[in-house]
């Protein structure tokens, strides 16, 4: 019953790397970020508006997090999200944290979302601060404390393939050691 949690900064490559780990291991992917985006769309809000709304409505985060916990308890899943690893750590075999420079992350978000670099810089910085405040007030979690992670990877100067390879190498080695058999 393998459980892998991938967390990290906005634009660090969480979803891309989690998706690839899930594909290689043949496991389903549960993305808190995608659930959050879907909730925002259903409420007719853009992503930043919804983050601000969630800051005063903690039930939103708790709803997403309870789904992550439920899936982690069931096992055989890759979970992805900014806070996911902190939430599912008791059930996770491997927790990976991805980070990158603000400029790199903004460039990725601009490319992904079709925004100007200036807008993406502002949005990424704002999202990060909103997340930090929200998680501290709701859960008492300091997202700058990375001590719970098995692997912390700076993706600033890595290609997607290199970041995926490093993450998979670590994950496969760790799981094989834990389960005393080859996992991937």
UniProtKB/Swiss-Prot annotation:
Q: Which residues bind ATP?
A: 8-16
Describe the reaction catalysed, as an equation. CMP + ATP = CDP + ADP; dCMP + ATP = dCDP + ADP
Report the EC code(s) recorded for this entry.
2.7.4.25
Where are the coiled-coil regions?
A: none
Q: Which InterPro entries match?
A: Cyt_kin_arch, Cytidylate_kinase_dom, P-loop_NTPase
Q: Its domain of life?
A: Archaea
Known CDD domains for this protein? CMPK (cd02020)
* GO biological process terms on file: pyrimidine nucleotide metabolic process
Entry keywords, A to Z = ATP-binding, Cytoplasm, Kinase, Nucleotide-binding, Transferase
Which family does the record claim for this protein? Belongs to the cytidylate kinase family. Type 2 subfamily.
**What NCBIfam families does this protein's entry cite?**
cyt_kin_arch
Q: Give the protein's recorded name.
A: Cytidylate kinase
């Amino acid at each position: 019953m393998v459980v892998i949690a991938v967390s990290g900064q906005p634009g660090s490559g969480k979803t891309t790397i989690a998706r690839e780990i899930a594909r290689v291991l043949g496991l389903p992917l549960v993305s808190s970020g995608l659930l959050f985006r879907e909730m925002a769309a259903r409420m007719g809000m853009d992503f930043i508006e919804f983050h601000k709304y969630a800051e005063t409505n903690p039930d939103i985060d708790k709803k997403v997090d309870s789904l992550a916990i439920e899936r982690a308890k069931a096992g055989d899943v890759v979970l992805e999200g900014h806070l996911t690893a902190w939430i599912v750590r008791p059930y996770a075999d491997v927790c990976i944290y991805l980070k990158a420079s603000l400029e790199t992350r903004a460039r990725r978000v601009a490319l992904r979302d079709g925004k100007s670099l200036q807008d993406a810089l502002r949005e990424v910085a704002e999202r990060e601060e909103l997340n930090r405040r929200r998680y501290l007030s709701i859960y008492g979690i300091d997202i700058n404390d990375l001590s719970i992670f098995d692997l912390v990877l700076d993706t600033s100067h890595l290609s997607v393939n290199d970041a995926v390879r490093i993450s998979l190498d670590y994950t496969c080695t760790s799981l094989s050691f834990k389960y005393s058999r080859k996992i991937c």
